[in-house]
Amino acid sequence: MHEVGFPLDLSVFTRLIATLFFLAVGVFYFLKNTAAKYFDIGAAAAGGFDRDFMAVDAEDCSVCGNFSTKKCSRCKSVRYCSAECQRSDWSSGHQRNCRDYGITTLTPSAKNGLRFRASPFGDSSASSIALISERGQNKSSLKPREVLFPYEEFVEYFNWDNPELAPCGLMNCGNSCFANVILQCLSWTRPLVAYLLEKGHKRECMRNDWCFLCEFQTHVERASQSRFPFSPMNIISRLTNIGGTLGYGRQEDAHEFMRYAIDMMQSVCLDEFGGEKIVPPRSQETTLIQYIFGGLLQSQVQCTVCNHVSDQYENMMDLIVEMHGDAGSLEECLDQFTAEEWLHGDNMYKCDRCSDYVKACKRLTIRRAPNILTIALKRYQGGRYGKLNKRISFPETLDLNPYMSEGGDGSDVYKLYAVIVHLDMLNASFFGHYICYIKDFCGNWYRIDDSEIESVELEDVLSQRAYMLLYSRIQARSSSSCLRSEVKDEKKTDTLDTESCVKELVESSMVGAIESRSSTHATIEDPVCEQSPSPSPSPSPSPSPSPSPSVLASECCSEVERIDTLDSESNSSIDDSATDHQEDVANGNKDPEVKYQAADSWSDPTTSTPLVCTKSKPPVRDMDTKMIDAQ
């Protein structure tokens, strides 16, 4: 007798159940990790703490003091070794103080697309998902700020002083001397160190991934507290994150690493306000990093045919100076940098006014000097053994006023505080060793060779064959808005030119209308409709913004209409006056060169103020100023 039904193999069924169980567990953990990555869980309600806000780090636990690998992902300041310690600290008061430590749960993440919103009923387990895109909400709702960092606060950091700080050596992690010297120079850049030690960046950081400024703050804090050399592996191991072409274990250029580091810090500052694509170019110049290293170069080109002058501005973070000919000092190199250059031959300049390639004179100057001036001497030329090893003397006090666009006001004076030297063999440019000389906040100079520190005199520093020089202004810039005033002046000049063009068009139409109205009218050249002042005294009006070209056109057109609508009596009086004027000229009673102003006999039927048409030339603009914003 056959059994009815599907035959069941117990071993196959067991394996199937086990497989389904492991698949379910895998899918569960996958969804859990995905949710933890893309959602912020808010449990700040009064119900208590039942979520683990953890992030990887390496500090001591704030509860038991053991080695910790996690931290609170809200404030990013308190660290724990386990979830039990975090729950204990949460219930003992961290729940109330977490907001004061740093970022709260309501702060939008810079990366997460969605977030969890805490339940209004006080039960943290009943948290609900707020299906609102944080990224899209930030871009559409955040209003662009004109000033990202207060300049007055920067001036306080610039004048900050801490004489107790002493230099600390850094261990060489394998061809990392190029990074060690830059980290030493940045660690003794006064406004940057003052900001990291006094205010700090970690609590305000909006990044969920690796942040160079956060790591550099940890580096500065450790260097200020340590008496022994330590390894900067937290930064060296992330060279590819700092610069795409940098690599761990390879010999790299110190100047290139510094450029990457400054650009990375600038990018971090912009991320706090939405990123480089959202922040306007003008506001990008108001970050802390721009206040420290940012300046402005002016490139001026003058046409030799029409004398047309064109100015272009470019943002600068450092100054790369070449060593041409017999230049033996930094001042001579700067003279060559700002010297006039003739554009001719195959390098002719295309003039916008001439619309042709012409011979021109070009000069590059400094429009706005930075607070921290970084000068890189271009010692490397073509070839593997093409390094220029000649000594270039440099002063302790550098006066930058002779190299400014407008001669300077005497305040662009700098003091030397760091020197980077590249040691090589046989003028090789592909290998060598970097050392640096640093001046502390008390004025003492030190020679730092990785982990070795030696006190030196100023004469030893000035005798070196420097590769990079770092100068600090004696006094911070008085204002950071000089570029904006220039742009405002440019816009005002452009507006005047536009108004003049509109006036010319209106004037030509007025002349045509008057001539067509009456052929016996007196001669009128290029009239510009104005109103003569009223004889009765009146209080001076308050200044008002200049009218737009459309308003000017409408006003002048209204004057034309009023002229065209003159009655026959006014026309006859004008004809009679013109006839009398011709008779006087014929009899010799009047000078024929004097133009009779027929408008004197015109009157507005609606007002007692007479209308006067006078000769007025539009302003001619010889300067075409352009602005190049650094991206």
From Swiss-Prot:
Keyword Transmembrane helix in record: yes
Residues of the USP domain: 168-474
Active-site residues (renumbered): C177 (nucleophile), H433 (proton acceptor)
EC number(s) given by UniProt: 3.4.19.12
Basic and acidic residues: compositionally biased ranges: 578-594, 619-631
InterPro entries: Papain-like_cys_pep_sf, Peptidase_C19, Peptidase_C19_UCH, USP_CS, USP_dom, Znf_MYND
Name of this chain's protein: Ubiquitin carboxyl-terminal hydrolase 18
Provenance organism: Arabidopsis thaliana (Mouse-ear cress)
